[in-house]
């Protein structure tokens, strides 16, 4: 009889944990009716968190990563800029360098769950950041010699469709 009550107690604890995990998994999703937020069966939609465009140029802590054997461009992430939103979006500053030394600096986000990326802003020659006019989520394309988004997602940012949780976890996975 004692064993039965212990198993019953453990079962209740496991059910509570599963319910909590389910609610946490839906945290970045909102319900149409705020009163339904704790209802696991309520229809939900994803909502992107408010973003802040960087105010400074990239740091000197650039982490290069491999994209393709046939690209002439060099790609690097500004390590201190990598952030993890409650909306499950990984945001970062990317620096692309041409063979002649020219650079393109952008602030972007990757959404592992949907295999999408978004350009938020670019840094101009004067060092000022300018918001992207047509910023929208786009599917990541894996083909092409400059498909750096696919390289970041496959090698470092995502574990299948689940985003990694820290820059310390991502940086070692970048293939230089």
Language-model regions, residue ranges each:
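N-terminal secretory-pathway/extracellular module detecting exported/lumenal segments
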Residues: 28-176
């Amino acid at each position: 009889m004692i064993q039965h009550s212990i198993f019953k107690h453990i079962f209740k604890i496991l059910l509570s944990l599963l319910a909590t995990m389910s609610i946490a998994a839906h945290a970045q999703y909102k319900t149409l009716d705020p009163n339904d937020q704790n209802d696991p069966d309520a229809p939900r939609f994803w909502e992107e968190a408010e973003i802040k465009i960087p105010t400074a140029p990239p740091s000197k802590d650039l982490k290069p990563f491999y994209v393709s054997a046939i690209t002439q461009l060099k790609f690097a992430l500004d390590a201190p800029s990598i952030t993890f939103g409650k909306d499950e979006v990984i945001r970062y500053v990317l620096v692309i360098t041409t063979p002649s030394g020219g650079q393109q600096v952008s602030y972007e986000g990757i959404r592992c769950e949907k295999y999408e990326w978004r350009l938020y802003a670019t840094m101009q020659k004067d060092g000022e950041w300018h918001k992207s006019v047509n910023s929208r989520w786009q599917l990541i394309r894996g083909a092409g010699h400059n498909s750096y988004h696919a390289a970041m997602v496959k090698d470092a940012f995502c574990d299948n469709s689940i985003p990694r949780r820290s820059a310390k976890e991502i940086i070692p996975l970048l293939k230089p």
